[in-house]
């Protein structure tokens, strides 16, 4: 079985994941104030309790999504590092054959 890897493709994928990570982080940052501080529609106990419950769920959601965005960012970095590793390995292998340049 042969695995053909294009380091430039991995670098492009890494950049795309980095851009996606930034967009997701921005979207979650703009949504966090709205979902973590739900305003009750009235001052009665049921409205207050429901709004507090929704706010607590919003806080939990914000934490989980932040962790997800962080993990996505780490995955993108890993893809980029893999591409750099393949590129270095290719250069080292080419050097053993006395090939100079590309």
UniProtKB/Swiss-Prot annotation:
Task: List, for all copies, the residue spans of the domain called PE.
Answer: 3-92
Name the source's superkingdom.
Bacteria
Return any one Pfam family short name.
PE
Question: Can you list the disulfide-bonded cysteine pairs?
Answer: none
- Give the subcellular location: Secreted; Cell envelope; Cell surface
Q: Any idea what a deletion of this gene does?
A: PE5-PPE4 double mutant exhibits a severe iron phenotype but secretes EsxG and EsxH normally. Mildly attenuated in vivo.
Q: Does the keyword Cell division apply?
A: no
Would you tell me the Gene Ontology cellular component terms?
A: cell envelope; cell surface; extracellular region
Q: What does this protein do?
A: Important for the siderophore-mediated iron-acquisition function of ESX-3. May play a pivotal role in the evasion of host immune response by M.tuberculosis. Mediates production of IL-10 via activation of the p38 and ERK1/2 mitogen-activated protein kinase (MAPK) signaling pathways.
What keywords appear on the UniProt entry? Secreted, Virulence
Which named protein is this? PE family immunomodulator PE5
* UniProt cross-references to InterPro entries, sorted A to Z: PE-PGRS_N
Return the similarity comment: Belongs to the mycobacterial PE family.
